[in-house]
Structures are given as structure tokens and as C-alpha cells.
A protein has these predicted regions:
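Active-site-adjacent helix-turn-beta-strand microarchitecture at beta-sheet edges
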Residues: 1-17, 110-118, 122-125
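Feature captures C-terminal
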Residues: 41-184
Length: 184
């Protein structure tokens, strides 16, 4: 009871903002697996639209509450899905080869056959593109069949694509916090 009272007291000055309703779910929204969940798709769709990008990259997290169909999406819900200290959104140009390298590197952190080389985490979430993954293959051969979902065209290694994402570890990332962008 004391802890519940303390939490209520701390949240009280922020209640109007955190209880603000942003929308309502049509389906189950979650972030629970090693690969994309439906909340990841929502975040990636917002990145694609608001940053006018072909491909979206979002960090692989498995936190935040799962919402049932018909539940309200509040600002607090969104904050729980995007709660990190480096939330800024970027928009940049990347080659198909570099995008594949990112996916391969993260996949190796997860699926390396040597458990001492597995660094944990989750697969980077993607929007606007599809790919196949074979976790039994060695690094460099796990990711294949990369395609742009809007057109169905194959992602070419030498071609440049417009990519939006967030949670960059690069210093000086300029752009709005992801929670502001998704709230639109």
C-alpha cells in the first residue's frame, strides 16, 4: 500500500499527459519475440510515414505491456514501449549491403553457434522490407531474400535506400524522440 501511494503521488502531476489517449487497438499489440511483434510494426509504420522512408529499423526490445484488441493506447503505453535514454529518430541513406550487414551482425549476436560469442538481445525490427533468416547458417549467410514490401523489388547491395530508425548509439543523432513521432 505504501508503494502504491508513492507511485500515485509521483505520477499525479503528470497524469494529464500520461493518461492522454492516442488511439485504440484493433488487434493484439505486443513486443515479446526475437523478431517483429505487432507493436514493433506500429512503431516502424510511423517511422516510415513520418520520416518518408523506404525502410525502418527499430531496436529489438521485449518490454512494455501487451494490449488486447479494443484497449486504449495512452501516452504512458507508448512511453513504456520506447523508454530509453537515446530515443531520437534518424533518417539516413544506406546501401542494401550495409542494411544486410546490420541484420547479419545482430543475428550473429543472437544465433552464433558458440555460446560464448552470443551477446544476447533481440533481432533488429524492420519495417518496409521483408527478409528470410536461417539461423543455422554462418554469419554472412543467415539473411537472404531482402525485398521492399511496397514494390516487391529485391534490395540490391549497391543501391541506396532511405532508412528511418531510432536508438542510434551514434552521438549527435538529430531528430524528434520516437515517442513524439509515433504519437502523431
Amino acid at each position: 500500500p505504501d508503494m502504491a501511494a508513492l507511485i500515485k503521488e509521483i505520477r499525479a502531476p503528470h497524469a494529464a499527459e500520461i493518461d492522454r489517449v492516442l488511439g485504440r487497438t484493433d488487434s493484439l499489440l505486443y513486443r515479446r519475440g526475437n523478431l517483429n511483434g505487432t507493436f514493433d510494426d506500429l512503431i516502424c509504420d510511423a517511422l516510415l510515414k513520418e520520416r518518408d522512408a523506404q525502410i525502418a529499423l527499430s531496436p529489438g526490445f521485449r518490454w512494455g505491456a501487451t494490449l488486447l484488441p479494443g484497449d486504449q493506447i495512452t501516452a504512458d503505453t507508448l512511453y513504456t514501449q520506447t523508454a530509453i535514454t537515446y530515443p531520437n529518430v534518424y533518417r539516413s541513406e544506406m546501401t542494401g549491403a550495409f542494411i544486410k550487414e546490420i541484420l547479419e551482425d545482430v543475428a550473429d549476436n543472437l544465433f552464433n553457434p558458440d555460446p560464448y560469442l552470443q551477446q544476447g538481445g533481440d533481432m533488429v525490427r524492420v519495417g518496409g522490407m521483408g527478409y528470410a533468416i536461417d539461423i543455422g547458417q554462418p554469419i554472412g549467410k543467415r539473411i537472404s531474400e531482402m525485398t521492399l514490401l511496397a514494390s516487391g523489388e529485391k534490395i540490391e547491395p549497391a543501391k541506396t535506400y532511405t532508412v528511418a530508425g531510432w536508438a542510434s548509439v551514434n552521438e549527435g543523432t538529430e531528430g524528434p524522440p520516437v515517442y513524439e513521432l509515433v504519437a502523431k
